[in-house]
From Swiss-Prot:
Keywords: Tumor suppressor. The lineage of its organism: Eukaryota, Metazoa, Chordata, Craniata, Vertebrata. Residues 1-131 form the VIT domain. Residues 281-469 form the VWFA domain. Residues 657-682 are annotated as: Disordered. This is von Willebrand factor A domain-containing protein 5A. CDD domains: vWA_interalpha_trypsin_inhibitor. Residues 669-680 have a biased composition (Polar residues). Signal peptide: none annotated. May play a role in tumorigenesis as a tumor suppressor. Altered expression of this protein and disruption of the molecular pathway it is involved in may contribute directly to or modify tumorigenesis.
Length: 822
């Protein structure tokens, strides 16, 4: 009987990757990360280890090195074609070789190859990168270390050269054969209020009395079976800031990396505006591929993605303003649309749309988003109704560049709000289609509710944004600014503006200060934010600001090797090689020439297993015979296609979980019992949620009809409800609408962010229609806030008995009617 010792995969192969250690340094709004992969070959033959992993597409990878038997081997960034050739040649000569590259078809997927790893050899491979930290809606900065890489569907014309084509072993999450350790140091002039995480962390340690520096770490033995998320809350996040960084001494003074570089950050506190009567064309593009049958989480009774998507569509439809236009597309291998073209928002069209939403299913096969996108863009625009596109997908598309390019080509006539569903959604796809069109991107993971995220973005779409944005600089004579970031025409409420610029000319010797002024308009009113800063550049060994600026320039020009011109490719190559930041045209390669053992036969190839979110749809990749391009006959390409891509069956289905963030200040471990109870109470099948049933009944204009369907939800009879109406001769819909709004406050408070917009529409309708032609009798006087019409009743009634005190409701309703008449 054969025995397998050590860590093995489900295929009985020993795993060369033993652990991953991450050192994270967060300074204000940016993060510097060093990730070390520890390999050991326990086999009796030389091997080549390949590790395919996801990384946020905004990450600027700038360093790759290996430590072998105490010797450091630093990789060089080269043209990708040359790097591949050098790697292959080194292996053929018996040298040890290392290769790190970005995938040809997706900017957020990387592969790390360790070639000719001799028996008994231990190697530590370290890659370093920097990135901007995105903002959450509540002002938190979010750092995400992604663990899950979903299977990605391939476009028909795609080459098999992608590392996504590699058959990656799947193992049960609890048996994942490597661990993760992470230490995070956080420093901010804004002051650190608290830190939260979805994983078990050590108690937070403040390193300074003023709480401007802190440290946290993952608890020992953490399995890399879920995305690791940190949420950092600063005390004064809206304060503008400017940081100036010294350039490299060995670079030309006026070059990208030689000149001082400034990063300007504005996070304006834009007031919320009631925008219930906003014109626009709202198109919702919903993923209906087989992967949408995947549960949102692994907990028992977790809601399916498609069910959450249907609820989300319903809430979005009910929250749209009267007078707008809308349409809904579903896409998979093919696509369907509700209407031939966008229709006006009326009671008839909304009723038809709601009925069709109820019948939606994840039944359209694979993921092909380009065709419906092109159909949307070729449709004639509606005068006076700018297009707002909402895209929902789990991101399982390989060729993200083609999709991004299509959105960018049409960016001047629309905004795109994108949503990545589940762990493993492509950050490259989701972020870039929003970025190039001036919209926003959201990721729905762990216990995030798709409904809440989508309604939050709709609020942004309905809000008045900052327009006519311009920057002006106040600098000493002789010093000028070269803007590296293009102009951003608008800033939405909750968005942050980060700008990169070069300072050219002689820097002042003595202490001197400059200033930046951001001018903009809000609803026709001119406003400005001004911040002063020191002109003495600070040294930074990582050159974080310079490399983030270089990454920004690369992102604006690099749409993949198959989508850019020769001139654009040349520009990207120059920026990448000058800054040391990885691009789709470059790769890191390192050779250990001290090892000179000729390889006898092919190296044993080992692909490191990852936690995978399997789908219910079979996915097939092209065979190796269809390879094209400069690597057609290379050994690396032959390795990538050693086996056809095997569809995942039910027997290998593994889901990754992500519990809700738990505060770690004063505690290190989240309460698992609370998580369990929350997950059990949260899920309802589509249509079973009573709050949703009430929302189903709302009319397009925001009102509710007084009928038995409504009173059944309210827990009373139609006769009793009519008898309790304080305005017997008025419109009964006013009474029904008041009761519906009160019921939502009493019974759906935990989901308020999801029905807040449709409540505003209801209140606006009451303001225009309630109490016409009525003369209400005297009633007790009390203060009523127009934004909180139910507080009086809620203070006097219990949730389960709220309709039993109809006299209070009558009194409140009379006050409401008078208030709206005024």
């Amino acid at each position: 009987m054969e025995h397998h010792w050590g860590l093995i995969t489900g295929n009985k192969e020993k795993v060369p990757l033993k652990s991953i250690s991450v050192t994270l340094s967060i300074n204000d709004f940016v993060a510097a990360v060093a990730a070390t992969l520890h390999y050991e070959n326990e086999e009796k033959v030389p091997i080549e280890a390949m590790f395919v992993f996801p990384m946020d597409e905004d990450s600027a990878v700038y360093s790759f090195e290996a430590l072998v038997d105490g010797k450091k081997i630093v990789a060089e960034l080269q043209d990708k074609t040359k790097a591949h050739s050098k790697y292959e040649e080194a292996l053929s000569q018996g040298h040890q070789a290392y290769l790190l590259e970005e995938d040809d078809y997706s900017r957020d997927v990387f592969s790390c190859n360790v070639g000719n790893l001799q028996p008994g050899t231990k190697v530590a491979v370290t890659l370093r990168y920097v990135q901007e930290l995105p903002l959450e809606s509540d002002g938190a900065l979010r750092y995400l270390l992604p663990a899950v890489l979903n299977p990605r569907y391939q476009l028909s014309e795609q080459s098999a050269s992608s590392c996504l084509n590699v058959q990656k072993p799947i193992v049960p999450l609890e048996a994942l054969p490597y661990t993760l350790s992470m230490v995070a140091t956080i420093t901010s002039q804004h002051g650190i209020e608290r830190v939260q995480s979805n994983c078990s962390l050590s108690p937070i340690q403040y390193l300074t009395d003023d709480k401007t520096s802190a440290q946290v770490s993952l608890t020992e033995g953490h399995k890399f079976d879920r995305d690791v998320e940190l949420l950092i809350y600063y005390r004064e996040v809206h304060s503008p800031s400017v940081a100036v960084e010294k350039g490299m001494q060995d670079k030309k003074r006026d070059s990208l990396m030689g000149a001082p570089c400034a990063m300007v950050s504005f996070y304006p506190d834009i007031p919320e505006v009631n925008a219930s009567k906003v014109c626009g064309e709202f198109v919702f593009l919903m993923d209906r591929s087989g992967s949408m049958q995947t549960p949102m989480r692994t907990e028992e009774n977790s809601q399916l993605r498609i069910e959450a998507a249907k609820e989300t569509l319903l809430l979005l439809l009910k929250s749209l303003p009267m007078g707008c236009y809308f349409n809904i597309y579903g896409f998979g291998s093919s696509y369907e649309q509700f209407f031939p073209e966008s229709v006006k928002y009326t009671q008839e069209t909304i009723e038809e749309a709601v009925e069709r939403v109820k019948r939606l299913d994840a039944d359209l096969g694979g993921t092909e988003i380009l065709t419906p996108l092109r159909n949307i863009y070729k449709t004639s625009s509606i005068p006076g109704h700018p297009l707002q596109l909402f895209v929902f997908t789990d991101g399982e598309v390989s060729d993200t560049y083609s999709v991004i390019r299509e959105v960018k080509l049409n960016s001047k006539k629309h905004r795109c709000f994108s949503f990545g569903i589940g762990q493993g959604a492509s950050t490259s796809l989701i972020k870039n289609i929003a970025r190039v069109s001036g919209g926003t991107a959201e990721f729905i993971t762990g216990k995030d509710r798709m409904q809440a995220k989508a309604l939050g973005s709709l609020k942004l779409a309905l809000q008045c944004a900052l327009d006519d944005i311009s920057l002006s600089w106040e600098l000493p004579p002789g010093l000028s600014v070269n803007m590296l970031s293009p102009e951003q025409p608008t800033i939405f409420r909750g968005q942050r503006l980060i700008i990169y610029a070069q300072l050219t000319g002689p820097m002042p010797q003595a202490e001197s200060r400059g200033a930046v002024c951001l001018k903009h308009t809000l609803q026709g009113k001119s406003l400005e934010n001004k911040v002063a800063f020191s002109l003495q550049p600070k040294e930074n060994a990582n050159f974080t600001i310079h490399r983030l600026a270089a990454k920004f320039l690369i992102q604006t020009k690099d749409l993949g090797s198959h989508e850019v011109s020769k001139e654009e490719k040349k520009d990207v190559m120059n920026i990448s090689l000058q800054s040391g930041v990885l691009s789709s045209f470059t790769a890191f390669v390192a050779i250990n020439k001290e090892l000179n053992k000729p390889v006898q036969g092919p190296l044993a190839h080992r692909v490191i297993p990852r936690p995978m979110i399997a789908t219910s749809t079979s996915m097939f990749m092209r065979s190796c015979s269809r390879l094209t391009g400069p690597f057609k006959n290379s050994r690396l390409k032959r390795r990538l296609c050693a086996a056809d891509y095997v569809p995942y069956g039910h027997e290998s289905t593994v889901y990754s979980s992500m519990p809700s963030p738990a505060p770690i200040e004063n505690q290190g471990v989240a309460d698992s019992s609370n998580e369990k109870s929350n997950s059990q109470n949260e899920h309802k099948a589509f249509g079973e949620n009573v709050v949703l049933q009430l929302i189903f009944l709302q009319n397009a204009n925001g009102s509710w009809k007084l009928d038995e369907n409504l009173t059944k939800i309210l827990g009373t009879t139609l006769e009793d409800t009519k008898a309790a109406n304080p305005s017997q001769h008025g419109d009964p819909s006013a009474w029904a609408t008041i009761l519906a709004v009160l019921w939502l406050h009493a019974n759906g408070q935990d989901l308020k962010c999801e029905w807040e917009l449709l409540e505003r529409k209801a209140v606006a309708w009451l303001h225009d229609h309630a109490g016409r032609g009525t003369t209400p009798p005297p009633f007790p006087s009390f203060h009523l806030h127009p934004r909180e019409p139910c507080l009086y009743v809620l203070q006097r009634t219990q949730e389960s008995l709220w309709l039993s005190q109809l006299c209070c409701l009558r009194t409140l309703s009379l006050q409401l009617i008078l208030h709206f008449q005024d």
